[in-house]
């Protein structure tokens, strides 16, 4: 091997080590700040004055979903990108379980914010019938129903996710399912919740004007 090739290889290895260290420490910082923020949110939304506030219940549920997502996904990410260790690459159970937890909880965090926007829309409505739907009782039913529907909606993950490819990777089965999964993420997580939040926020502003 020539000296120039050896130098290039050393530079590549150095860059890889730097990249791994940045990933590890960046993810650790992100994890600490994310969990700290979520814990503060949980502390605020569990105060006595907010315990029966439906909007606060939705925010608390969103924060809880975010916390579960962080606790499950971030350790795997640190192991994967920082140490090249990822049990989802060779343990099918880990593969299916991790993504069946992270995808629904990530989506739930957004959908609970949608419910909070809908609650504000109902609360600000001049129609007394609409205002009655903004209540602790409605929220106590809506939250578990939403959790159930989202996890049912993502039931295809443990069915169609598998380990394939060289090198092995945990992903959806190639072919039609990959296409479906792309559209599913766009609608259920990428564009659906933000669009509904925008719509109900605009409608709420119209109510309070």
Functional labels for PLM-detected ranges:
Residues 34, 38-44, 66, 70-73, ...:
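Helical transmembrane-bundle signal
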Residues 1-37:
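Extracellular N-terminal segment of 7TM GPCRs
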Residues 2-14, 80-105, 131-133, 137, ...:
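Loop architecture of class A 7-transmembrane GPCRs
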Residues 32, 61-64, 101, 145-148, ...:
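Hydrophobic residues within alpha-helical transmembrane segments
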Residues 33-36, 112-125, 158-164, 186-209:
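Class A (rhodopsin-like) GPCR signature focused on the TM5-ICL3 interface and adjacent 7TM helical core
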Residues 42, 47-57, 120-142, 198, ...:
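Intracellular signaling interfaces of 7-transmembrane GPCRs
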Residues 19-26, 57, 137-145, 181, ...:
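Alpha-helical transmembrane segments of integral membrane proteins
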Residues 16-28, 55-115, 123, 127-130:
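Extracellular TM2-ECL1-early TM3 structural module of rhodopsin-like
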